[in-house]
Amino acid sequence: MKVRAQVPTVKNATNFNMVADSKTAVGSTLENLKAAIAGETGAHAKYTAFAKAAREQGYEQIARLFEATAAAELIHIGLEYALVAEMEPGYEKPTVAAPSAYSCDLNLISGANGEIYETSDMYPAFIRKAQEEGNSKAVHVFTRAKLAESVHAERYLAAYNDIDAPDDDKFHLCPICGYIHKGEDFEKCPICFRPKDTFTAY
C-alpha cells in the first residue's frame, strides 16, 4: 500500500464498494460494532492457533506473520470495543472456543478468505450503515480496519505463493490501525501516518 497525500477515507478513495451478493447481516451501528468485535475475536484466536501450527511445521516467518496479524486484530477489537462501551456501558467482550489449525498453506488461504470477506463485504456494509446513522466515530474505526484487513489478505496470499521460498524480512505492525508492513522500506503507516519508529517488529 502506497502512502497517499491524505489519510484514505470513504470520501477520497474508490475501493469502498460492497460486493453485490453480501453475506453480512447488517443491523444498527451498535449491533455492527458488536458483530465486528465477535469476528475479530474469532480471527485473533484463529491466527494465534495458526501461528503455533506454522512454527511446529517449520514455517517461522509465517508464524511471525500470523502473530502480527493476531495482534492487529486485538487493535481492531480495542477500537471497536471503546465505541461500544460509550454506547452501552457494561458490555462484555465475547469469548470463542479454541479453533483448529491445519497445514500451513491451508491456514494461509483460510486467513486470506476471512480478510477478503471483511474488506469487501463486512466493513463496507458497516461503514455504509454508520454513515446513514451519522456515526462518524464508527465510520472512522471501520474504515481503518477495512484498509488494514486488505493488507492482511495481501500478506497471507504472498506468504502462500512464497511458502517454499521464505526470506528473512520482518513484519512491522502499526499500533494504531493494525497495518502490517513487510521489510524495512517504509517511513510511516500509509493508513494512519504513524511513524515507523512506533511500529512493533515480528
From Swiss-Prot:
Residues 169-202 form the Rubredoxin-like domain. InterPro entries: Ferritin-like, Ferritin-like_diiron, Ferritin-like_SF, Nigrythrn, Rbr2/Nigerythrin, Rr_diiron-bd_dom, Rubredoxin-like_dom, RUBY_RBDX. Residues 23-168 form the Ferritin-like diiron domain. Exhibits NADH peroxidase activity (in vitro). SUPFAM superfamilies: Ferritin-like, Rubredoxin-like. Keywords: Cytoplasm, Electron transport, Iron, Metal-binding, Transport. This is Nigerythrin. Its main location: cytoplasm. Coiled coil: none annotated. The lineage of its organism: Bacteria, Pseudomonadati, Thermodesulfobacteriota, Desulfovibrionia, Desulfovibrionales. It comes from the Bacteria. Homodimer. May possess two rubredoxin-like centers and two hemerythrin-like binuclear-iron centers per dimer. PANTHER family: RUBRERYTHRIN. Fe cation 1 binds at E40, E73, E118, E149. GO terms for molecular function: iron ion binding; oxidoreductase activity. Fe cation 2 binds at E73, E115, E149, H152. It is found in: Cytoplasm. Fe cation 3 binds at C174, C177, C189, C192. GO terms for cellular component: cytoplasm.
